[in-house]
Amino acid sequence: MSKQVEKIKELIAKREQARLGGGEKAIEKQHARGKYTARERIDMLLDEGSFEEVDMFKLHRCTNFGMEKKQFLGDGVVAGSGTIDGRLVYVFAQDFTVNGGSLSETMAEKICKVMDLGMKMGAPVIGINDSGGARIQEGINALGGYAEIFERNILASGVIPQISDIFGPCAGGAVYSPALTDFTLMMENTSYMFLTGPKVVKSVTGEDVDQESLGGASVHSTKSGVTHFTASTEEEAIQMIKTLISYIPQNNMEEAPRVECSDPINRMEDSLNEILPDDPNKAYDMYKVITAVVDDGEFFEVQPKFAKNIIVGFARFNGQSVGIVANQPSCYAGVLDVNASRKGARFVRFCDAFNIPIVSLVDVPGFLPGTGQEYNAVILHGAQLLYAYGEATVPKVTVTLRKSYGGSHIVMGCKQLRTDMNYAWPNAEIAVMGASGAVAVLYAKEAKGAEDPKAFMAEKEQEYSDLFANPYQAAKYGYIDDVIEPRNTRFRICRGLAQLACKKQNLPAKKHGCMPM
């Protein structure tokens, strides 16, 4: 046997060793938890045979606490590039079978390498997190590794899409990387995120709480809004990531992939002509409007369990990827509040950063009143949504279906925020406030002296409605470009987006804006 053949056999053996991660027993434990290994997850995510691994043989350099005896090839993270539906992506997956997936200086170097490559090549970076946190034995070097990753998250923001999958624990400083990325997905029952764990919470505050209640997928998908998606199985999670990737571009210099569309752009949807209740205060389901107008009724929702009074997500019109922002009248009448404003603003800014047109479907009676909202800075959060719409230079199309009152009218993509196409249905009520509220302010004194105050106020409400509670007053001043028949909504949106395909709009030169936080 020649030396070259011996070397090749040695290489093959080392590769096999590296692929075992922490060893067969550790892999069995991972499977016993109902979880896949890092390599299995990457294999499910990427096109078959497309994965190109880097730093397979890298080892940590720590000698503290006997760590020199705990060496595993790759040091607990699998990293490299591959394709999803033929499109280049960079990926890293922490390997819980190696030292609990704890982050070392070496692991951070591997993660940073693929992040740098993603920036250089203009391709999305997908991180699969399953880690016990910083490798304590390495001390400050592990913390420095986190900081290196965070800096790259920041530099890559708005340049390439960044997606975080939480498939296990993610605690302490480790949570900041997913928080800095564009989208986060958490596994139900097997993943959690928090800065301080239950034991620390107990020792500091005396509060008894378990991991799931403190930072599980349910908490972060419904209460905090930290995560955008949840999945019950890893297969489902991987498929969600693939679907998400299909709607977004490779980087901020490109557009999202356009797909072939067999759904006619001039398809009339007669059901929309009767979808609004006769009573303007009665709810209806905005999802029915969305699925009626988008290509083939397909809508990929983002943060579906958080701030349900506003709906955001991706769809297509004539094969073109768009971001949908819509008020939901069946949840709190579609009012805007702190969480809805945060959710909407973040999504609008992502779409603008990555050249995805924004279609807004408006039915909003105002902002939610109350001390709870004011104490939680609804002013600042509402201003975030206003800022996001006003800053966005992508094509913007707004359709007002029914109510659009006061400040909420402005922040939901009004004409003065440089929205390109503003349409309204005939039922639209575009005004400072609703008729009853306006009349209560305008005629309070006169009503007291009226022979029949109720009849007097009813008459004045009707007068106000006739004057303001319609789309024609706004159309008269050019704030609405056209009043359209509801069943024509899909066609008008498609045609509007086609007109705006070559839109170019520049902002004043600046280092960056100071968005209210």
Language-model features: where?
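Ligand-binding clefts of soluble mixed alpha/beta catalytic domains
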Residues: 1-517
